């Protein structure tokens, strides 16, 4: 349950009423507002003499709490401010030379951010698992050289010490989208979070994952749609372009789309990216490699520089049309 004082002057009275009720609650500051959060139900709250406050069952992500769209700042980039943001880079960081070449080229071609995996959640333990801290250091080095803010996936709370101060935005991948311990932990930090949907999540379940972060006081959340698993195997996952407008209607949070993973094959990535932009995505996350066929992970879906050049030109043109 979320209780929002209608006026800053009413905050002490709301707090006193909750304390007098012996109800367990906590105060959170989010988007310039003071909120009181309790695990009690709306029925319980009805009997508390709270005046001049809005009571909602849940949904810090919803437009009931914040009507205007949120934008999230990552380095010198604003996601959700009206300009299409494109994050590009390899699925996995493989070497200093590889990452520097990719970082310089994607910036030259118009990318706003550098993506790259240092800790890799792979389906089998025998696949390349990433370079770990070495990869993080490489990301920071290329970021400092190119000026591109970075986004990289965090898999475990214990790894946060490696990311802090080195990576600008933390990605929570599909497999961790309901890792509630990790989500709560990130809610206690101010770091921007790119939250992907789980392979079998409904939109409501995914938004509730965002709620774990928001309810800790961290409002810097971007929702990233990466498709869901279905019976169809022509593509790696099913990308429902209807998910983006539904998210924009139900939530004030910025929406990113990852067309690389649902495509599974590079020839489909641009088309899915165009569909995401046409449906209202604020951001795209694209896998790009200097030698895709030799990539250590997700080789089939990574674009080469020519493919990325064509994609980014076309999505920028489309964004100008759809606004």
Language model features: what each stretch is:
Residues 74, 189-288:
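Catalytic alpha/beta core domains of metabolic enzymes, predominantly
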Residues 131, 148-156, 168-181, 191-203, ...:
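Catalytic beta/alpha-barrel core
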Residues 73-91, 122-125, 248-257:
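N-terminal small/glycine-rich loop or linker at the start of catalytic domains
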Residues 84-90, 112-116, 150-152, 170-172, ...:
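Hydrophobic faces of well-ordered beta-strands that scaffold small-molecule active sites
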Residues 5, 57-87, 320-323:
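N-terminal amphipathic alpha-helix/helix-capping segment at the start of soluble metabolic enzymes
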Residues 128-152, 186-192, 241-256, 301-323:
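Alpha-helix-loop-beta-strand connector modules within alpha/beta enzyme cores
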Residues 115-133, 290-300:
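Glycine-rich, proline-tolerant flexible connector loops at the mouths of alpha/beta enzymes
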Residues 84-101, 125-129, 149-153, 174, ...:
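Active-site mouth loops of central-metabolism enzymes
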């Amino acid at each position: 349950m979320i209780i929002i004082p209608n006026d800053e002057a009413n905050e002490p009275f709301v707090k006193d009423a909750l304390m007098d009720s012996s109800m367990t609650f906590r105060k959170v500051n989010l988007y310039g507002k003071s909120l009181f959060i309790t695990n009690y139900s709306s029925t319980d709250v009805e009997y508390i003499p709270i005046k001049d406050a809005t009571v909602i069952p849940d949904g810090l992500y919803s437009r009931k709490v914040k009507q205007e769209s949120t934008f999230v700042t990552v380095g010198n980039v604003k996601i959700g401010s009206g300009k299409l943001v494109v994050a590009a880079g390899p699925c996995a960081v493989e070497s200093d030379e590889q990452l520097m070449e990719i970082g310089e080229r994607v910036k030259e071609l118009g990318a706003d951010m550098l993506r790259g995996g240092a800790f890799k959640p792979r389906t089998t333990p025998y696949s390349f698992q990433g370079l770990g801290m070495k990869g993080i250091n490489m990301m920071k080095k290329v970021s400092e050289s190119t000026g591109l803010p970075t986004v990289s996936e965090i898999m475990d709370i214990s790894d946060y010490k490696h990311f802090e101060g080195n990576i600008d935005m933390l990605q929570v991948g599909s497999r961790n989208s309901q890792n509630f311990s990790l989500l709560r932990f990130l809610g206690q930090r101010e770091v921007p979070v790119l939250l992907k949907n789980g392979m079998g999540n409904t939109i409501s379940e995914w938004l509730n994952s965002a709620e774990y972060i928001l309810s800790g006081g961290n409002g810097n959340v971007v929702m990233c749609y990466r498709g869901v698993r279905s019976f169809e195997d022509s593509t790696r996952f099913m990308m429902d372009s209807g998910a983006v407008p539904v998210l924009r209607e139900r939530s004030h949070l910025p929406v990113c789309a990852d067309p690389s993973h649902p495509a599974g094959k590079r020839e489909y990535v641009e088309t899915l990216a165009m569909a995401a932009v046409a449906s209202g995505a604020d951001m795209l996350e694209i896998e790009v490699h200097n030698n895709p066929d030799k990539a250590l992970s997700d080789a089939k879906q990574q674009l080469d520089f020519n493919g990325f050049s064509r994609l980014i030109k076309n999505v920028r043109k489309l964004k100008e049309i759809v606004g």
